[in-house]
Amino acid sequence: MALDLSALQRIIADENRLLTGADIPAEYQSDVLGRVHGSAEALAFPLSTEEVSALLRYAHEHRVPVTPRGAGTNLVGSTVPLEGGIILDLSRMDRVLELDEDTMTVTVEPGMLLQDLQAYVEARGLFYPPDPGEKASSIGGNISTNAGGMRAVKYGVSRDYVRGLEVVLADGTVMQVGGKQVKDASGLSLKHLLIGSEGTLAVITKCLLRLVPKPEASLSVLVPYADLKTGIQSVLTILRANANPTAVEFMERKVVALGERFCGVSYPRPDAGSYILLTFDGRSEEVTANAARVRSLALQNGALDFIELSDARQCADIWRVRGALVKAVEAVSEQEPVDIVVPISRTADFIRFINGLEAQSGMQMVSFGHAGDGNVHLCVVRGERDEETWQRELHENMDRAYAEAYRLGGVASGEHGIGLSKRPYFLRQTAKENLQAMNAIKTALDPQHILNNGKSYLTGGNNNAGTF
């Protein structure tokens, strides 16, 4: 059904917050990598729950597709408008609504950026642990994909810090789930159902988040190894040592070299084949003791060195390279980002498989990621392949990679979500009964199937989405 522009204008009267047709910027109609494109008839910037509710009520009554969007940093095409309709951009709903220091919670709107929330609470002696690599991502987006990041090995992921949500269902109904209480054994946990649903079940309008005290001290350590296998195997020993690291990252030397050139800095021990980058936080004496324990274990298990990054400039440079690895690869060639997760004990097996696949196929695959939780980030590099060859070889190799991940007990995504790019692999590898249950929940909450249709687990609507 064609949009009734006058109806939308009655909901959002400010012409600067309602764009249509050719006035919609191109970046709103593609993914952040610029590879998947869609189209929409309207782009709305609501400022309140009431406006979101009114827009969804209109869309539900007239069966108009709606694509929720936060900061637009998603890497798997979750915010691409596949079926036209309305893009619902929540980026201007970005306020802190309440800081409750007694319950150690903060209530924010979904458009607030992660980096702004972290700065706000840390200035007040508090700490929001989830730490996805893209600091300019939105809190609503983080919750919608259950984003994790480097601190997940110690602190957990976004789901672990959501106490409550205000959401708007597809028909405009406003619903509160969760609350400031610590325990809740009352009925189904609707909050957990909505977290990670990628905008397919409801639109988040308020986020009640759990905070912890800001750590007193923090220390990062760079541990070089001759090869990646030795480094990954030593991680299991470190994790069993009760040293409680905040982050345990692994990087192959070949991707670090790209990051060094991109950032204009150098890592120590360029003779290494891989690096493990760790952080410890907590009380000063606890940090010192844990680092000393890990130093001994690492050197006993093949580490070439144990470099404490006590110099603030050096530490910042080392972490800047780690944070820029995807962009560093992208600067050299188009690439496909992957964030498969396997059991920690199978991380080395999966990387061994990927290295073999790279050698067999001739397609470069550089790996890094969160060794502490088995989340492997791959950059699959296009190189000089023409479009037809790139698409064919990419999908052939990704079919094999995802199949191996599932064989090892893993899943398609640790933190990016399924969106479009992982959808074909997810649908093939997920049990029919699970998909039927997910789609039944979708139909119950969104009977018209207007919210972010064709994404993630959905098997209705645009069934061809996700192949690009």
Model-derived regions, located:
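Noncatalytic alpha-helical scaffold of FAD-dependent oxidoreductases
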Residues: 1-468
